[in-house]
Amino acid sequence: MKSAFWFSFIDRINLKIFFILLFVYQILFTFQGLDLSDEGFVGTFYQQIFSNPESVQYNFMFWLSGIVGGVFNHFFGESGIWGLRVFSAVLTTASIILVYKLLKPYLNATHLKIGLIVVTLFLSNNTKVFHYNYLSVLFYILTISFLFKGLKENGWSYFFISGVFVAMDTLTRIPSIVNIGLVIAIFYHGYKNKTAFSHQFKQSLFFIVGFAGGILLMLMVMKLIGHFDIFINALKLVVQMGGSADEGHYGLLKLIQQFLGSYSASLKYAFIILLFLLLVAVGVDYYRTGPYYRKWILEIFKYLLILFVAFLAVVKVIDHKMLLYFLTGTSLMAGFLILMSDGIIELKTLMLMGCYILLAYPFGSSAGLITVGIYSLWIAFPIAADYFLNIRKADVSVNILESNAQFKAKLLAEGIQWNAVKRYTTILCIGACLYYAWYYPFFDYHERTDMRYSVNSKYLRGVYTTKERANVMNELISESSKYIKPGDYLLAYHSMPLFNYITRTVPYVRNSMPWFYNTSVFNAELNLAYERTKVLPVIIRQKRKTFGKSGSAWPDPEPFYDAIWYKKNAPRDSCMNIFLEKNNYSKVWENQMFEILTPPVSK
């Protein structure tokens, strides 16, 4: 199928320039947005993993990303948060190139580029610094690439290498252990090609041995550098927290409920929107072929529809989550249609692996699809985009037979109708991604034109936010310098690990973001911290929520009071208050967002 004229630029653009433009686009979004939580959480991990690894024990479920980040911090630590953001853009661009090379033989090149553009634009709204998800994406793409190469070329070593990458992915992000299930692609491909089961078994055995060997080797490295016991303690902690019915982020029942709820919503949104698009295509044909006045009606309807969708995005009826659901749902629906078709076995195998990642990758995350679903789209969505953009004809027939009568109806869409629908749907998807990237910087919901002020920290050079946010941070940095210095223990409570990072202080409770702890674990860590360090730390405490829909505009007033969130935090806050009272802490300074508390004397 020839590309429509509006595809011509993407179709003709030099491939190297295409990749460079995607890289530059990511870099453009690295200069704005100040996040206290996630970026500081991983940044502190990289600072402390070699010098004080026990202080970041909680992060050890992401051990390999900590090693990579720690090495980067050793050589480029002075580049701070901005440097880590550039590093993530480098890894993402590497992932884009690998996906392109993997899928190019089986997809229309223009459609593949469009799929990669949409995922890249959608990603720019999320956490920007290098962290475990960016590294995990690279590893699962390499896993699939080598596994697929092994299937095509019957190379035993490729299966082994693929298994090693699963091992590396697992120690980058523990939930990625589920990627061992990609072995299903070996049996699917073998079944479709009528390969002897004994041969399939040998292929899968090399894959499993590669995984086991990779895990064993990295555990040995952990042992050699003194990280093994800390890693085991981190795993025990995750299991312990998963058993908490009320507060645990990793409880099995909670993860299953999230899984079912998120993917059912994704399929629902995708089905409704795709059905609507079919009806639009039918309408286009009706008004295009009739009297001339119908064409005017069609033109008016087209622009009214675009304005209506834009309005829904502005008033947040269509939001970032709904867009994620749509991309996920369309990928799964395309996966089902491709697997049920008589298409190329290789493409079906790739889509099977892409859908497996799309379903399995978010499962072990504390918030499931909502937080990490975006990182699972890299294989499935470009294939889905190619599938839907290649559709030439679609029809839906209804035939109701009753004893005295028969009702028949048929919706048919083909040719020029689909071209218009595909064109505007793609434009709206890209437009929505750009809109949310522009108006909703990660946990810094402010007008970008107002985000031109920096914070007085060398680790935040090149990162700009609003004047108000910069001011409250500068006040805190200036005043806290009277009480802390690099290398001191500090408890930044409860969701502001960035402060540990920019002051190079050591997390007191073996986790720079105590909000991740449930109440019982936090209480135990407070008591254990004093026994371990014999130090009562300076405490920096935030006064209100600093992330999510209600908190991301700080220090501006919260748009609404998140009563459920504050109620859930109350038991942990109570433990904090008991600790402060027991040890006679006093408030020595505060502004509208933060307060500094100190013990009476150092013990």
Residue ranges and their predicted role:
Residues 86-106, 142, 281-286:
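Transmembrane-helix motifs of polytopic, lipid-linked glycan transferases
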Residues 28-46, 56-72, 78-82, 225-227, ...:
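Extracytoplasmic catalytic/substrate-binding loops of multi-pass membrane glycan-assembly enzymes
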Residues 105-107, 143-159, 195, 336-345:
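Membrane-interface transmembrane helices that cradle and orient dolichyl/undecaprenyl
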Residues 123-124, 146, 158-185, 209, ...:
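Membrane-interface alpha helices of multi-pass inner-membrane proteins
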Residues 2, 152, 179-216, 220, ...:
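Perimembrane helix-loop-helix junctions
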Residues 99-121, 157:
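Transmembrane-helix signature of polytopic, membrane-embedded enzymes
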Residues 128-137:
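Short acidic/glycine- and proline-prone juxtamembrane loop motifs at membrane-interface regions
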Residues 432-517, 536-550, 592-598:
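Short periplasmic/luminal acceptor-recognition loop of GT-C membrane glycosyltransferases, typified by
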